């Protein structure tokens, strides 16, 4: 049976750096991207933690002779647990002058000499295949032995690289690929890219998008300019021009436009509230949606936005579009907002109109 030791006070984010490109995460960092529940300790096959509200609130260790089975959430016989947690021991049982997978990084490998590991990484977009003993492209689905945060967090998330502040690791189907933001730096607190360096100062709290909490002000002129001839019986609804879900209600050409927004889960388009993916809104598409990911328009359905507090986080904004982050697996290049995942084929259809 597991014994849980509750921790109190501030939690220090400890990073174990073994070589320049290794990516060992503390349990505190793992909890930042993990729902409530138990997680494995990426630095110890015997240890585990408990996450609550994205914080590490407890730690524990299995009895001697047992290892933590993350799939079952129990302390289990070593025969039932596959765990490699320390790259410095990668060469202990390897043949001298040979190459082995870096157990902390899927696109890394180590050269073994006198039981000592010297680790490096494969070229960009490639992973190390421990069976073929060579670097191959991710679409070939190489066997990855890395016991990294991608083994412990939900699928299709981007996490910060603890050894290279401002860079990220994309996690898809348990496999992690290191990357850099084209627009600048990755902010691990916000889960997205930004132009300023988050490593120079404390990262800000996520901003809240327009109309998410506070209503926008009414508009005294919108009904005169765009309202046509509205009446109390036949009001006219006009986009607020700032959000995807907001509108102005006009009941008189001379009266003010009263701001309102669609019911949760809907966006406003051409006078009515509709399913969000049926039109390419050019404002923050996270608004009014209880989603972790939404599609980014004008990217041919190959990019997506990360949402927190109904607001896209840290994404580049350019030419009236949120660019977002790409699906990194070349075998699954298209993002589908309906399923919330990267898929093989484009979701474009007569009703799914984000692929513009």
Curated annotation (Swiss-Prot):
Expressed, tissue-wise, as follows: Larval peritrophic membrane.
PTM entry text: Glycosylated.
Q: Which cysteines are joined by disulfide bonds?
A: 62-75, 122-135, 181-193, 262-273
A GO-annotated cellular component = extracellular region
- Tell me which residues are glycosylated: 114, 309
Q: Which UniProt keywords apply?
A: Chitin-binding, Disulfide bond, Glycoprotein, Repeat, Signal
Q: Which residues form the Chitin-binding type-2 domain?
A: 28-85, 88-146, 147-201, 220-283, 286-355
SUPFAM superfamilies, sorted: Invertebrate chitin-binding proteins
Q: Give a yes or no for keyword Mitochondrion in this entry.
A: no
- Which residues belong to the signal peptide in this entry? 1-23
Pfam families associated with the record: CBM_14
Which PROSITE patterns does the record associate with it?
CHIT_BIND_II
What is a single molecular function from GO for this protein?
chitin binding
| Entry-linked InterPro entries | Chitin-bd_dom, Chitin-bd_dom_sf, Chitin_bind-dev_reg
Q: What does this protein do?
A: May have roles in the maintenance of peritrophic membrane structure and in the determination of the porosity of the peritrophic membrane. May bind chitin or related oligosaccharide structures.
Its name, as the record gives it, is Peritrophin-44
Q: Which organism does this record belong to?
A: Lucilia cuprina (Green bottle fly)
